[in-house]
């Protein structure tokens, strides 16, 4: 398990950076440390060692080796001080396409004023399943008896009333040896929306849904009722720091496998319907299934200080017709009041380094769960990282992409800087890749497509990412990717602008970086290609434990593919991994990559709406689950303490404009509050 990714600082600078000369930096930093995330490998490419905290000193390259002189004294970023890591479906929903089209035409990005949005969920109706269920009366009666059907303590009469309807809905399936089934349209009448497990006083939902806004998630479970007509009566409040245009609802079902028709029926239907085959497979392995979605349009650009009711007891029909929900949505603009650490409950430590801590926190007024990263100002100043720290905050505040971890708030105390980010708890892509060894073609394509959107959104803001690798990619609760760690980003890079800072991770360094030729945005397409190759084979294409040898391979070794490698993926990789940046796929814009045959079955508009069901869903029990984080950190007690580090007024002035609660810049002065050590 791995902890929240904490931004790493670059060792050394080039002439692009202000404040110190290269000689001064060389003297200050000496030989850097590279972070190696790959353990020793088996001959088949699968990981032998799952510990990715290996750190290797980079020796000075021998002048007799045939490598560029620019590599003789590499000025690299330092990872040593941070001990923590932080099947596309066939649904062609016209509603998804239409909403995505509307979203894609608005290029100005989200408005940035703060407020609170309250969502009240009352009930649901007309929920159905995509398959029939057994009509076995013993199984159905036992399941209903364990359910919470009404507000009364005794549901026996309700169970009896439901069971009396069974003959009316039972049918005989002539295609499966005369098995008695209940049609998919009526099956939910006989399934409770939640049940009480034996020996437990807590209910377990068989139907539930999530509400997602700006990567903040709330899970809504029913209080009572059948799956056909669940009763929720729940309220959830969201912090609004960006006025996004949609609120996303996803409905899930947790179907006991005993309810499924016979194995013969499942085999027969699976041969006819691949989608249903995958659904049945998930149920048989005790996985929740995704039933339906809805993108609720929002108009939060309201010039009013009063609370506005956006929807009043409004029935929404889910996009694929599997049910309806009754909701009310209110929005209240709020005054731009700067936050402090006292506005949060500290729940868990999820990361730690010499700079401070990363903690799971709960915002007291909305009860929303976030990741709070605390950066010690004295450490940042001592490492000459003020510019890059401010750049990271700027990128996070400006970016508008569903596949990038968004900044919710930032504030400061006299001793610290704080970033409050969406809490993404599905684990690092690195961990999942180590566990699997390699990914399937469909799974690799899905992740690369979402990453392509993330990088494109950064490039449109004239930002180069420069550090794409599995450790910097998180999975959310559904399995969508979330790019994080923007400590090596370079801002204000137009299409043809070049920079020459030597930074990154060895396995992913592009040839133009090694050659010291300067590089443009196309360096990100090289790293995207390296990552795709690693996903599909288990190792980067030029990997070697000996760093100088690996550099030689990056510059000289032909790109090799295993037998049976997908032809479209091979062609894409040849384009992305062109050593000549001027001929690299993507040099003329992201559409060059999007239009490649490798992505021919992907609707990019649907993808941006998170309209595809991810090929893998991480094991996440709830929005506060920290099981995918390193227990070395989560077992620590979160402590709010004072840091005694005095900084002069001139140094404090460097952190002016750090505060963010919905506006790009709201405050220049550090608040007088407690800080986290």
UniProtKB/Swiss-Prot annotation:
What reaction is this protein's catalytic activity?
A: L-seryl-[protein] + ATP = O-phospho-L-seryl-[protein] + ADP + H(+); L-threonyl-[protein] + ATP = O-phospho-L-threonyl-[protein] + ADP + H(+)
What Enzyme Commission number(s) does the record list for this chain? 2.7.11.1
Query: What positions does the domain AGC-kinase C-terminal occupy?
Result: 600-670
Primary localization: cytoplasm
Keyword terms = ATP-binding, Cell shape, Cell wall biogenesis/degradation, Cytoplasm, Kinase, Lipid metabolism, Nucleotide-binding, Phosphoprotein, Serine/threonine-protein kinase, Sphingolipid metabolism, Transferase
List the residue ranges of the region (Disordered): 1-115
- Segments of skewed composition (Basic and acidic residues): 41-56
The record lists the organism as: Saccharomyces cerevisiae (strain ATCC 204508 / S288c)
Domain Protein kinase positions: 344-599
UniProt name for this protein: Serine/threonine-protein kinase YPK2/YKR2
- Note the InterPro entries from the entry: AGC-kinase_C, Kinase-like_dom_sf, Pkinase_C, Prot_kinase_dom, Protein_kinase_ATP_BS, Ser/Thr_kinase_AS
Q: Which residues carry this modification: Phosphoserine?
A: 72, 641, 650, 669
Family as reported in the entry's similarity comment: Belongs to the protein kinase superfamily. AGC Ser/Thr protein kinase family. RAC subfamily.
**MF terms per GO, please?**
ATP binding; protein serine kinase activity; protein serine/threonine kinase activity
Q: What is the effect of changing residue 373 to R/A?
A: No kinase activity
| SUPFAM superfamilies given in the database record | Protein kinase-like (PK-like)
Q: Which GO terms describe its cellular component?
A: cytoplasm; nucleus
| Misc | Present with 1310 molecules/cell in log phase SD medium.
Modification after translation: Autophosphorylated. Phosphorylated by PKH2 and TOR2.
The active site annotation covers 467 (proton acceptor)
- Pfam families of this UniProt entry? Pkinase (PF00069), Pkinase_C (PF00433)
């Amino acid at each position: 398990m791995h902890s929240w990714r904490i931004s790493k600082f670059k060792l050394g600078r080039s002439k692009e950076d202000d404040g110190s000369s290269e000689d001064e930096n060389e003297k200050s930093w000496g030989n850097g440390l590279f972070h190696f995330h790959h353990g020793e490998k088996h001959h088949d490419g699968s990981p032998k060692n799952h510990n990715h905290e290996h750190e290797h000193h980079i020796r000075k390259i021998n002048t007799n080796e045939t490598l560029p002189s620019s590599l003789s004294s590499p000025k690299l970023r330092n990872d040593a001080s941070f001990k923590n890591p932080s099947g596309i479906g066939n649904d062609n929903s016209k509603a998804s396409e239409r909403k995505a089209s509307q979203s894609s035409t608005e290029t100005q990005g989200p408005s940035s004023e703060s407020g609170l949005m309250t969502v009240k969920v009352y009930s649901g109706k007309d929920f159905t399943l995509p398959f029939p269920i057994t009509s076995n009366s013993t199984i159905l009666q036992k399941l209903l008896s364990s359910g919470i059907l009404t507000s009364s303590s005794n549901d026996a009469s309700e169970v009896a009333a439901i069971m009396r309807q069974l003959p009316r809905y039972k049918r005989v399936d002539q295609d499966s040896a005369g098995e008695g089934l209940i049609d998919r349209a009526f099956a939910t009448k006989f399934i409770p929306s939640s049940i009480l497990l034996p020996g437990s006083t807590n209910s377990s939902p068989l139907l539930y849904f999530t509400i997602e806004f700006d990567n903040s998630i709330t899970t809504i479970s029913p209080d009572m009722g059948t799956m056909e007509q669940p009763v929720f009566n729940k309220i959830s409040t969201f912090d609004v720091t960006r006025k996004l245009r949609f609120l996303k609802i996803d409905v899930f079902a947790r179907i006991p496998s005993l309810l499924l028709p016979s194995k013969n029926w499942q085999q027969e239907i699976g041969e006819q319907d691949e989608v249903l085959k995958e659904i049945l497979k998930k149920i048989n392995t005790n996985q929740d299934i995704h039933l339906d979605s809805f993108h609720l349009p929002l108009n939060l650009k309201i010039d009013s200080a009063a609370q506005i009711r956006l929807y009043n007891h409004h029935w929404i029909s889910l996009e694929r017709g599997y049910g309806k929900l009754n909701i009310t949505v209110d929005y209240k603009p709020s005054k731009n009041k700067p936050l402090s650490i006292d506005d949060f409950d500290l729940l868990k430590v999820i990361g730690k380094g010499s700079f401070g801590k990363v903690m799971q926190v709960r915002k007291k007024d909305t009860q929303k769960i976030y990741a709070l990263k605390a950066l010690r100002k004295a450490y940042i100043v001592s490492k000459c990282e003020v510019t890059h720290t401010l750049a990271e905050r700027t990128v996070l505040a400006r970016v508008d992409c569903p596949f990038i971890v968004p900044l919710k708030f930032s504030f400061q105390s006299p001793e610290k800087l704080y970033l409050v980010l969406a809490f993404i708890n599905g684990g690092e892509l690195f961990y999942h890749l180590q566990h699997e060894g390699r990914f399937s073609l469909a799974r690799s394509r899905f992740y690369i497509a979402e990453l392509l959107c993330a990088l494109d959104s950064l490039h449109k803001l004239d930002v180069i990412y420069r550090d794409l690798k599995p450790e910097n990619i998180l999975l959310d609760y559904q399995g969508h990717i979330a790019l994080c760690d923007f400590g090596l980003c370079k801002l204000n890079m137009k299409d043809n602008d070049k920079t020459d800072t030597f930074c990154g991770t060895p396995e992913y360094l592009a040839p133009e970086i090694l050659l010291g030729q300067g590089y443009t945005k196309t360096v990100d397409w090289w790293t995207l290609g390296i990552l795709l190759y690693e996903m599909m084979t288990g190792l980067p294409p030029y990997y070697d434990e000996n760093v100088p040898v690996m550099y030689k391979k990056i510059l000289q070794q032909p790109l090799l593919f295993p037998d049976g490698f997908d032809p479209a993926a091979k062609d894409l990789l040849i384009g992305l991994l062109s050593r000549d940046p001027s001929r690299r796929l993507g040099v003329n814009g992201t559409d060059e990559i999007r239009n490649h045959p490798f992505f021919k079955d992907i609707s990019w508009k649907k993808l941006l709406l998170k309209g595809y069901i991810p090929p893998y869903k991480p094991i996440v029990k709830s929005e506060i689950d920290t099981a995918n984080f390193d227990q070395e950190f989560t077992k620590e007690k979160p402590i709010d303490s004072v840091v005694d580090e005095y900084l002069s007024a001139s140094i404090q002035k460097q952190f002016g404009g750090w505060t963010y609660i919905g506006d790009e810049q709201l405050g220049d002065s550090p608040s007088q509050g407690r800080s986290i050590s």
